[in-house]
Amino acid sequence: GNINDVTDVSDDGDDTDGNTIDDPTVVEISPSPSIEATKIAEVLDDNADDKTGPGDIINYTITIENTGNIEVTDLNLIDTMTDGNGKPRTLTTGPTYVSSSLNSQRGTLQVGEIANYIASYKIKDSDVEGARIENSILAIASSPNNSGDVTDVSDNGIDTDDNTIDDPTVIMITYVRKYFEIFNLVTPNGDGLNDYFELRGIENFGPNEVKIYN
């Protein structure tokens, strides 16, 4: 018997478009650029005192992901850092570009691509009063034919803190400043006021000894 092959190319079903046979089905995809920034912190206890305080290093890992459906370019990062009293602070190093998941040039992100950056901050003695360091980063990129239209403020990467978007990365300072105070007024007259020579906080600076000279 004879074998007859029957073929057909699909039609889009729209006979009002001036093409009634074998025309492709076209779906228009609207550009939707977006990025997501995340900043995670880890403390290096430089003096090994088991406290977060002066001299310790806060190491930041920053990721910027293209979560939209088109490529973005001209990616820039603007860092904002303050202590617990709102006083501005500045990163010690970075942000420094490290790599990207799809090997694009620095500043360019393909769809789904993630760029990685690092930064650090060395805690100062003046930071103790504020009790914490707050840090966030603003990522700014451009979609095709636009400039600086794609932005995101970093999240801290912790989704169990009841704040899943745009929350700053916070490091608490657990170091407590040591004090030493000498009271130079002594009136040993039994009235209950200044009857004894007193040193406060000397236990914070041991071993020690006290010598009194007339």
Residue ranges and their predicted role:
Residues 1-179:
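Exported/extracytosolic protein signature
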Residues 175-214:
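Short loop/turn motifs at secondary-structure boundaries
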